[in-house]
Amino acid sequence: MKELKYLFAYTVPMAAFVSFSSTGIGTYAAVIYAFVVLPFLDVVLGKNDTKWDESERKNRIVNTIFDWMLYLNLPMVFGLMSYCFFQVTTQSYTTSEWIGLSLSAGILLATNGINVAHELGHRQLFVERTMSKILYIPCLYMHFYIEHNFGHHMKVATPEDGATAKYNQSVYWFWITSVSKQYADAWKKQMELLSAKNRSFFSFYNDMLWYHLIQPLYILAVLVLFSQTAMLFAIATGVISFLFLECINYIEHYGLLRFKTDSGRYERVQTHHSWNSNFTIGRIVLYELTRHSDHHFKSSKKYQLLESHKKSPHLPVGYPASILMSLVPPLWFFVMNPRVPTEMKQSV
């Protein structure tokens, strides 16, 4: 029954539902839950770096409940966002309530949308990869599928990687550099993939073209089915969701670097090239994304198999608290700069 702990990841959609059903301070329910309740629970429950024996590992490989707990996020996310669009179409809100609703929807899309899409995007089954792309749609970040899988995992912890934050780089400047570079790199990688198979720019297999068709159609569908207000809200929440994603990218690799070998190539990705976190609640809610060192060490590993490595650098607090800390650059630098290995300290 240990696998059922990941049902706790559905508490974020539950908090989002409360936000969408409320007025006043209630519209901030998901925000309060994500950045007050979860950090508090991380402190109270602490860390867990337990490793599984061989029999438990084998059970986790074949037990499909881990997969279904991911799949259910798709109808949950689209169902809740549809409800939210209905609410913003039929109800009147103050400026403060609009902010609460937007942030709450952005948190839902980031945690149960982008995060789950990221996990499914590393799978081999066509249906799982398709589900991944669908979950990226409301986040307006479909190109991330290409750049992350074919770019970031190859270039992580190098100056060439847009998703690796440099030492002394603030999260706000990182938003600009990461978002712009990852988009450009996604196009570059797409053209390389097409060229490798002698396919033209207008090929059916140009996923980037499809993404630029599908995402506007999604926005248009929100306009037709709901309202202009809902359409603008959909755009705003999509942007908020991928900025939350970029906060996570920021804390996952901040200041860490791979060095070039005598051959001129970068050293192999090791467990010390990502910041790890074993805080229990953050691990569960984010489907073990916080064990990021192991994810980069072997990206084909499913979330339920990810483990902690002793040589991995560790964040002093869980992911929710780390995101908050990153939003205050002086505090982030004060806490994290001393933890970055001296030989890696190459400032932006």
Predicted features, each with a name:
Residues 58-179:
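Intramembrane catalytic core of multi-pass membrane enzymes that act on lipidic substrates
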Residues 1-45, 64-87, 96-110, 204-249, ...:
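Alpha-helical bilayer-embedded segments of polytopic membrane proteins, i.e.
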Residues 1-23, 53, 125-133, 137-208, ...:
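Cytosolic/stromal cytosol-facing helical appendages immediately following the last transmembrane segment
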Residues 45-59, 257:
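Membrane-helix interface/capping segments
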